UniProtKB/Swiss-Prot annotation:
A motif (Interaction with PCNA) lies at residues 239-245. One of its GO terms (cellular component) is Cul3-RING ubiquitin ligase complex. Keywords: Acetylation, Nucleus, Phosphoprotein, Ubl conjugation pathway. Belongs to the BACURD family. Induction: By tumor necrosis factor/TNF in cells. Residues 269-294 are annotated as: Disordered. Residues 32-100 form the BTB domain. The modification N-acetylmethionine is found at residue 1. The modification Phosphoserine is found at residue 23. GO terms for biological process: angiogenesis; heart development; negative regulation of Notch signaling pathway; negative regulation of Rho protein signal transduction; proteasome-mediated ubiquitin-dependent protein catabolic process; protein homooligomerization; protein ubiquitination; ubiquitin-dependent protein catabolic process. One of its GO terms (molecular function) is identical protein binding. This is BTB/POZ domain-containing adapter for CUL3-mediated RhoA degradation protein 3. It is found in: Nucleus.
Length: 315
């Protein structure tokens, strides 16, 4: 159970129980605590908070409307409980900080409309109008150190995608298509960051040890990596080849969305398990990560033997 500014919330779902209809008419609003089950999220709050402003909740708990309760006395409200704590805070304090993302403001607006919280409704509408003025706005941090990268990923509540590109790491010449493929990787990263910036943390790394490499993170740890470079012997000398594995990048980006928090409760572990996500295969994690590292190492060291090497082998 987690304390939330005077209210308590339990986010775990509760099994269905027998329900009955009751009325709160005549209850003392100054002292009575009530238990609310809002879409499976459980809240404790006071009658005073619920009846402080003229909203649907005041109508429910002042006797003007009947309410449903289960056998344990929880008041049942058939709405998503994600933003109900914000609704309660607004009713009690008259003000509340709004979420940053447009999607969450829209979700909160829908709840404010349902509960008839006029002041919060107007604030959400004003915030959305301001976002219409200034958006689209996409922030992509460029990391300055590995510690900064670790801190960004560890403190983010979103899955993360990092593109490392650093042409100066190359010891050899590039193959003919490498520059074009490098640009294609950068352009795809920019397009993905514009499309998913509200749901995924996108990070650029221009100081790492690789030349072109994608990394995908969920729940604060690396889930997958797509290395786009290899050393080849296509000519008489070594060359660095940069590839553009577009389909694989799209696949890993979509997979990383499975680690997105659902209704403030973290990723859906059942879905991760069904789709082979890391949460569903934690007991094989070390072995799988080791195999992935070996696979990446093999991909990075593809060698095509030179004609003179093949000649020596036949002698």
């Amino acid at each position: 159970m987690e304390e939330m500014s005077g209210e308590s919330v339990v986010t775990s779902a509760v099994p269905a129980a027998a329900t009955r209809t009751t009325s709160f008419k005549g209850a003392s609003p100054s002292s009575k605590y009530v238990k609310l089950n809002v879409g499976g999220a459980l809240y404790y709050t006071t009658m005073q908070t619920l009846t402080k402003q003229d909203t649907m909740l005041k109508a429910m708990f002042s006797g003007r409307m009947e309410v449903l309760t289960d056998s344990e006395g929880w008041i049942l409200i058939d709405r998503c409980g994600k933003h109900f704590g914000t609704i309660l805070n607004y009713l009690r304090d008259g003000a509340v900080p709004l979420p940053e993302s447009r999607r969450e403001i829209e979700e909160l607006l829908a709840e404010a409309k349902y509960y008839l919280v006029q002041g919060l409704l107007e604030e959400c509408q004003a915030a959305l109008q301001n976002k219409d003025t200034y958006e689209p706005f996409c922030k992509v941090p460029v990391i300055t150190s590995s510690k900064e990268e670790q801190r960004l990923i560890a403190t983010s509540d979103k899955p993360a995608v990092k593109l490392l590109y650093n042409r100066s790491n190359n010891k050899y010449s590039y193959t003919s298509n490498s520059d074009d493929n490098m640009l294609k990787n950068i352009e795809l990263f920019d397009k993905l960051s514009l499309r998913f910036n509200g749901r995924v943390l996108f990070i650029k790394d221009v100081i790492g040890d690789e030349i072109c490499c994608w990394s995908f993170y969920g729940q604060g740890r690396k889930i997958a990596e797509v290395c786009c470079t290899s050393i080849v012997y296509a000519t008489e000398k070594k060359q660095t080849k940069v590839e553009f594995p577009e389909a694989r990048i799209y696949e890993e980006t979509l997979n990383i969305l499975l680690y997105e928090a659902q209704d403030g409760r973290g990723p859906d572990n059942a879905l991760l398990e069904a789709t082979g996500g890391a949460a569903g295969r934690s007991h094989h994690l070390d072995e799988d990560e080791e195999r992935e590292r070996e696979r990446i190492e093999r991909v990075r060291r593809i060698h095509i033997k030179r004609p003179d090497d093949r000649a020596h082998l036949h002698q």
